[in-house]
Amino acid sequence: MELLKLNRSAQGSGAGPGASLCRAGGALLNSSGAGNLSCEPPRLRGAGTRELELAIRVTLYAVIFLMSVGGNVLIIVVLGLSRRLRTVTNAFLLSLAVSDLLLAVACMPFTLLPNLMGTFIFGTVVCKAVSYLMGVSVSVSTLSLVAIALERYSAICRPLQARVWQTRSHAARVIIATWMLSGLLMVPYPVYTAVQPAGGARALQCVHRWPSARVRQTWSVLLLLLLFFVPGVVMAVAYGLISRELYLGLRFDEDSDSESRVRSQGGLRGGAGPGPAPPNGSCRPEGGLAGEDGDGCYVQLPRSRQTLELSALTAPTPGPGGGPRPYQAKLLAKKRVVRMLLVIVVLFFLCWLPLYSANTWRAFDSSGAHRALSGAPISFIHLLSYASACVNPLVYCFMHRRFRQACLETCARCCPRPPRARPRPLPDEDPPTPSIASLSRLSYTTISTLGPG
């Protein structure tokens, strides 16, 4: 990802890739590991302002870095150890966590340290690697969100067709394809990335040196289309159809409940006719309350009489408050999952929209972008793009009940409590007498064994 190439100070003049964007008398304030230098006239900024801005920037970087690394490592561990969370959707969320962790570990330190030191000291290899890994991470995150949206659409709106290919092995193949496609798409970054001298005598910067301004513009527009607009349209359409299907499913269940109540009260005469047809692409669950991560509905196969009798005996009865039926509970669970995924998508695009816009603006009007975005705006855009790596763990913790439970179970497994030692009876104490419940259980067992007299 071409991160913050807006305020670059390079030797040379003109409108080419090496053109200087700093005015005469400008002072070098910071340099980014991605090759960005911010230059502003010293008369506009005092030493106290620069120190305060630097302290705020370092603090925010540290907080975002720790939250990104800790949160995504926790996601990877929990999804890897919990068998209940090994679903198709969570497989894509696991890939998303890996890409976010890659963005935090491989890019953030090499962006902050050059800002503090005023030069890029890591060499050409690290410069090319950081630029490449940053682009791969953003591309994988975008494609993973698209894959999740399409998978949810197939599971909820086309459940019969989705059951043929909706498996973890198919999800693994899709994940591998997203990483390979992202790796091929970002090949131009290491090819056209280099370390070159900056404004100072010994200052270096990691920059993209495109062959021409037209190539840079074409590349910016291509990334804007492939990684922002097209995925955004696909996800908007998919989640719109999903919301419509869930709404129709809830309406269908409400109509079924009202018709059942009317029949039980004798409102309908002449026998029980066929109920309302389910919405298009929907089906009834096979039974049981749905989990929070249901992957769709299953086809209800015909059962034998013994199975039906056993189901009638063991079926859960609604509570006194009139709890939701299994089908309604499954739809509500799907609604919660879709709501969580929508929050993830919205936050991702909110974090990256300013950067895509800034890069496209710079590709067509570098001097205007520099004048408008120098200083605090570009720092905010920078931090906002990196904040996308730490928002997903927060969303999971606040909106995913099973993930919270799995986190607690994982922590309990890693830090088990020592078992409490039972007090030993003293030698002069009598042995414990059986309780009333034990006697009742013993009497019931004896009577059941002997049978009727």
Swiss-Prot record:
It holds the Pfam family 7tm_1. The gene is CCKBR. One of its GO terms (molecular function) is peptide hormone binding. It is found in: Cell membrane. The chain crosses the membrane at residues 58-79, 88-109, 132-150, 171-189, 221-243, 340-361, 380-400. A lipid is attached at C414 (S-palmitoyl cysteine). The lineage of its organism: Eukaryota, Metazoa, Chordata, Craniata, Vertebrata. Belongs to the G-protein coupled receptor 1 family. Disulfide bonds join C127-C206. Parietal cells, pancreas, brain and various neoplastic tissues. Residues 258-286, 422-453 are annotated as: Disordered. This is Gastrin/cholecystokinin type B receptor. Residues 80-87, 151-170, 244-339, 401-453 are cytoplasmic. It comes from Canis lupus familiaris (Dog). The keyword tRNA processing does not apply. Glycans are attached at N7, N30, N36. Its main location: membrane. Residues 1-57, 110-131, 190-220, 362-379 are extracellular.
